[in-house]
């Protein structure tokens, strides 16, 4: 012990090169590649997760009609933007719906019109990119008609990846115009380049101020009107009101001013809404007929894919919604989409769709058809389309 070797070094003095060396740190390139690979794995996982609820289930299974949105849609329009919303430079006067008289006495405006039905529901992929896109004023609006099939048309269109629509009825151009366009825009869903923003409020078609107001927003707005046999539409309208207020008078008593003389009471909105030619005249003062598409409510039942093809063409969209998206629900008697938007499960519109209509006296129906016939013929001429109601 303590003996020194030649050269004056202790036996414990071992050359450093004989000791094990720590591994060299990985070069920066390896770290970057590892981080990039990890990020790619996370992105791929999120993409596949999103597609599981969206790519495999584009269409939505919904019945025809204009009722409330399917229950799976989450709320999105409950609040207005923070702070005081910008307003138009004037206080807009109350809109003047052409419906009046008995309708006001009955309080027949349904809850579906009075409050938002169900707000917009983004698909899983759009939720993943919720920070993307921007809110735009609508480029297309379904303006009517009540009980014509507007809800079904909107839900069918929402299957299309290039259509983004607000689920509730905004009622901006008839009830909330004084809140301003900034408030209206904030109700809309976010869209990406190439997507169309839409909304539907059937009461616009019978509101005198609506054509000028929409034109002031944009003269290029595309307008869609879903129309239906006015007699059937009136009975459906009455049936909806009856379900809310069972104590209202009979359809027959509301239809006539004087049944003996056969005078139809056009102050009742259920009758007045069906005078399509009269309402269309107001719209043609502000929009050319080429900017309006008239969809047959009857064909939405008998040939939904065909009617949706016309709508997609009108909106400049690729024909993605086709026959393969639909099946016929024998219980309800309506076509449905095979899969709901953002879901792999079938779903039809609510229980209020396909209500059984009350029995109406055949003589009343005959007189109503006689009343509507000249208006229908004029409507056919104005639109260039025979809807075959007579």
Swiss-Prot record:
It is found in: Golgi apparatus membrane. InterPro entries: NST/OST, P-loop_NTPase, Sulfotransferase_dom. Ubiquitous. Most abundant in liver and placenta, followed by heart and kidney. Keywords: Disulfide bond, Glycoprotein, Golgi apparatus, Membrane, Signal-anchor, Transferase, Transmembrane, Transmembrane helix. GO terms for cellular component: Golgi membrane; plasma membrane. Its EC number is 2.8.2.30. Residues 123-133 have a biased composition (Low complexity). The keyword Disulfide bond applies. Its main location: Golgi. 3'-phosphoadenylyl sulfate binds at residues 147-151, 228, 236, 353-357. It comes from the Eukaryota. Residues 1-32 are cytoplasmic. Residues 1-25, 74-133 are annotated as: Disordered. The chain crosses the membrane at residues 33-53. Pfam families: Sulfotransfer_1. One of its GO terms (biological process) is heparan sulfate proteoglycan biosynthetic process. Residues 54-390 are lumenal. Substrate binds at residues 169-175, 200-203, 268-269. It is a single-pass type II membrane protein. Disulfide bonds join 336-348. Sulfotransferase that utilizes 3'-phospho-5'-adenylyl sulfate (PAPS) to catalyze the transfer of a sulfo group to an N-unsubstituted glucosamine linked to a 2-O-sulfo iduronic acid unit on heparan sulfate. Catalyzes the O-sulfation of glucosamine in IdoUA2S-GlcNS and also in IdoUA2S-GlcNH2. The substrate-specific O-sulfation generates an enzyme-modified heparan sulfate which acts as a binding receptor to Herpes simplex virus-1 (HSV-1) and permits its entry. Unlike HS3ST1/3-OST-1, does not convert non-anticoagulant heparan sulfate to anticoagulant heparan sulfate. This is Heparan sulfate glucosamine 3-O-sulfotransferase 3B1. It comes from Homo sapiens. The lineage of its organism: Eukaryota, Metazoa, Chordata, Craniata, Vertebrata.
């Amino acid at each position: 012990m303590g003996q020194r070797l030649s050269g004056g070094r202790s036996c414990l003095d071992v050359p450093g090169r004989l000791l094990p060396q720590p591994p060299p740190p990985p070069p920066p390139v390896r770290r970057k590649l590892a981080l990039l690979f990890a990020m790619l794995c996370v992105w791929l996982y999120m993409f596949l997760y999103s597609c599981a609820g969206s790519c495999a289930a584009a269409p939505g299974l919904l019945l025809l009609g204009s009722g409330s949105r399917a229950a799976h849609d989450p709320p999105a329009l409950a609040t207005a933007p923070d702070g005081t919303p910008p307003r138009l430079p004037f206080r807009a006067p109350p809109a003047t719906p052409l419906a009046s008289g008995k309708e006001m006495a009955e309080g027949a405006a349904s809850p579906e019109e009075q409050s938002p039905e169900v707000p917009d529901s983004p698909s899983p992929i759009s939720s993943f990119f919720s920070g993307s896109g921007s809110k735009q004023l609508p480029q297309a609006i379904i303006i009517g008609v009540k009980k014509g099939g507007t809800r079904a048309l909107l839900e069918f269109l929402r299957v299309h990846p290039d259509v983004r629509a607000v689920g509730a009825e905004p009622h901006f151009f008839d009830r909330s115009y004084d809140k301003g366009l900034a408030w209206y825009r904030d109700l809309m869903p976010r869209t990406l380049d190439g997507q169309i923003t839409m909304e539907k409020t059937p009461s616009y078609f019978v509101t005198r101020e609506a054509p000028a107001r929409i034109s002031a927003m944009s003269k290029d707005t595309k307008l869609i009107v879903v129309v239906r046999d006015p007699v059937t539409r009136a009975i459906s309208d009455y049936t909806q009101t009856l379900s809310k207020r069972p104590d209202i008078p009979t359809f027959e008593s509301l239809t006539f001013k004087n049944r003996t003389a056969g005078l139809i009471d056009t102050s009742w909105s259920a009758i007045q809404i069906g005078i399509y030619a009269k309402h269309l005249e107001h719209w043609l003062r502000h929009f050319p007929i080429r900017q309006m598409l008239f969809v047959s409510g009857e064909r939405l039942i008998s040939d939904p894919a065909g009617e949706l093809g016309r709508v997609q063409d009108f909106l400049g969209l690729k024909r993605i919604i086709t026959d393969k998206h639909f099946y016929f629900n024998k219980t309800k008697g309506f076509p449905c989409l095979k899969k709901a938007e953002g879901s792999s499960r079938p779903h039809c519109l609510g229980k209020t769709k396909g209500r059984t209509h009350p029995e109406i006296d055949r003589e009343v129906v005959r007189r109503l058809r006689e009343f509507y016939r000249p208006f229908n013929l004029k409507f056919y001429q104005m639109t260039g389309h025979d809807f075959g109601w007579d």
